[in-house]
From Swiss-Prot:
The keyword Membrane applies. It comes from Bacillus cytotoxicus (strain DSM 22905 / CIP 110041 / 391-98 / NVH 391-98). The chain crosses the membrane at residues 12-32, 43-63. It is found in: Cell membrane. One of its GO terms (cellular component) is plasma membrane. HAMAP family: UPF0295. Pfam families: DUF2614 (PF11023). Belongs to the UPF0295 family. Keywords: Cell membrane, Membrane, Transmembrane, Transmembrane helix. This is UPF0295 protein Bcer98_0460. The keyword Transmembrane helix applies. Signal peptide: none annotated. It is a multi-pass membrane protein.
């Protein structure tokens, strides 16, 4: 079985959600240090900053999501948003591309990196 790919927008949203829970956990750890006000306040502030960072990530991905290309997946016929040259469907994980040079090739997220040099086989 190959690597399980996920939609880029969903990956970023999952990261933001994990920041919320990590921030709450860090802030909750501060409760165990009630005797030392400095340590308790430090944990509470770090937790608050993690939750605040998740807010910024959610805002950023929301703004980015409005600028993405919206296409209809050929497999499930549901609308999905696509970031980059290659992505997968949000609903059925079907590999998608808008680049005609990549059609028929094996799906690889490395195609989205700018450092990849593509060789021209028609020379």
């Amino acid at each position: 079985m190959g690597i399980k790919y996920s939609n880029k927008i969903n990956k970023i949203r999952t990261f933001a959600l994990s920041l919320v829970f990590i921030g709450l956990l860090i802030a909750y750890l501060g409760v165990f240090f009630r005797e030392n006000i400095i340590i308790m306040t430090t944990f509470m502030m770090l937790g608050f900053l993690a939750v605040l960072a998740s807010t910024f990530v959610y805002f950023w991905i929301g703004m980015l999501s409005t600028k993405t290309v919206q296409i209809v997946c050929p497999s499930c016929n549901k609308p999905t948003k696509m970031l980059g040259r290659v992505d997968v469907c949000m609903h059925c994980n079907q590999p998608l591309t808008l680049d005609s040079n990549l059609e028929g090739k094996e799906f690889d997220e490395k195609y989205n990196k700018k450092t990849i040099k593509h060789t021209n086989i028609y020379k």
